[in-house]
Amino acid sequence: MEQKWEEAEKILSWKEMQTGVYSYHGIERRGTNDYGRPISVVTLERGGVKKMFYAPASLYWDLKNRSETNFIKYEGTQTSAKGYDYPVFMYSA
C-alpha cells in the first residue's frame, strides 16, 4: 500500500502542464470515473525529464484513435460555453 501512495504522489494533474512540446511515451488506462469516462495516466518528457500526468478523457481518446504519436503540444486551456475549462492539445508523428 505504501508503494501505491508514493506512486500517486508522482502523478500530476494535467492542469500542471506547461504550454509547449512534450515527447510522448504512452498512456495507460487506470479505470473509469463515475460518468464512465476513462481515468488514465500519460507519460510525457520535456527537457530530459519524464513526468506522469492524469490525462483528461479527451486526450485518452485522441491518443487511442491515432496510429502514431511522438510529440504532444499543450497549448493551454479554453473555456466551454457552459463555463468549463478544457485542455487544447496538438499531435505530431
Task: Label each region the model flagged.
Residues 76-93:
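OB-fold/S1-family single-stranded nucleic acid-binding modules
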Residues 49-55:
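A short macromolecule-binding patch
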Residues 17-20, 58-75:
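Short nucleic-acid-contacting surface segments enriched for D/E, G, S/T with interspersed K/R
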Residues 1-49:
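OB-fold ssDNA-binding interfaces and closely related basic DNA-contact patches used
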